[in-house]
């Protein structure tokens, strides 16, 4: 079998598609993670066919692995994502719900009216959020996140003597969203070590974690003037934790 086997339906990819659709239903920037992880799995399939010496391993992997992977992850994910809009579809007066009816001949005409309205809703939301730029005391740019340059304030009060347990002239009460400095500052050398291990030892585990971290972090640099906050970094923090654990594991 010079072209190698066809893996058919891979349930773990199907499950990944379900999770992907649910993730995008919560936060759109999940798309970057899904793209990175999906491409990684196809790359691993390509490399596996190359290692066993199959004929035209790159082309066959794209056809026999890449196309099924697309439908199992992206196709399934799209259906799950649309299901998160069930309430919007069932409504008759939701925001943008009647856009296609009120704007005949406009938008993506090959889509059914319901989906055309939903698409325009997405376009409008994307334009608003990607261009959102307004001064905010606790805003922080992406380059500040790893060094905890500007935590996000969730609560602040200045009670005076005799109120809220304050026993001096003036007190401060604050709740800040800030990571553990010992862990977050350790992420930076961990990233550098992981890059060196990847380059020198070709350790795919660090490569995978770096790719997924990059997918969650670097897209934010495309919007240098957008109002952003430190808590945006929480989406890729789990992968940095795994990266740090992997680097510490090198010493064991």
Describe the residue ranges of each PLM region.
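Membrane-interface anchor segments at the N-terminal boundary of transmembrane helices
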Residues: 137-140, 149-206
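Transmembrane-helix signature of polytopic, lipid-linked glycan biosynthesis machinery
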Residues: 24, 213-228
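Structural signal for the C-terminal ends of transmembrane alpha-helices
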Residues: 1, 39-50, 193-202, 248-252
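Perimembrane helix-loop-helix junctions
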Residues: 2, 9, 33-74, 95-97
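Membrane-interface alpha helices of multi-pass inner-membrane proteins
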Residues: 3-27, 38, 217
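Aromatic-rich transmembrane-lumenal/periplasmic boundary elements in polytopic membrane proteins
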Residues: 62, 68-69, 73, 77-150
């Amino acid at each position: 079998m010079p072209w190698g086997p066809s893996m058919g339906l891979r349930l773990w990819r199907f499950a990944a598609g379900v999770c992907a659709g649910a993730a995008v239903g919560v936060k759109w920037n999940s798309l970057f993670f899904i793209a990175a992880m999906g491409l990684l799995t196809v790359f691993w399939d390509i490399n596996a066919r190359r290692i066993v010496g199959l004929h035209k391993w790159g082309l066959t992997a794209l056809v026999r692995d890449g196309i099924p992977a697309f439908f199992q992850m992206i196709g399934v994910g799209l259906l799950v994502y649309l299901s998160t809009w069930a309430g919007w579809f069932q409504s008759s007066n939701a925001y943008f719900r009647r856009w296609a009816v009120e704007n005949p001949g406009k938008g993506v005409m090959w889509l059914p009216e319901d989906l055309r309205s939903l698409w325009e809703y997405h376009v409008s939301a994307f334009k608003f959020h990607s261009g959102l730029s307004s001064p905010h005391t606790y805003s922080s740019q992406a380059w500040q996140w790893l060094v905890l340059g500007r935590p996000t304030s969730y609560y602040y009060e200045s009670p005076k003597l005799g109120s809220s347990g304050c026993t001096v002239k003036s007190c401060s009460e604050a709740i800040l969203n800030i990571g553990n400095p010992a862990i977050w500052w350790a992420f930076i050398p961990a990233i550098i070590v992981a890059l060196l291990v990847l380059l020198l030892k070709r350790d795919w585990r660090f490569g995978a974690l770096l790719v997924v971290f990059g997918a969650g972090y670097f897209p934010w640099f495309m919007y240098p003037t957008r109002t952003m906050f430190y808590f945006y970094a929480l989406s890729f923090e789990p992968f940095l934790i795994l990266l740090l654990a992997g680097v510490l594991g090198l010493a064991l």
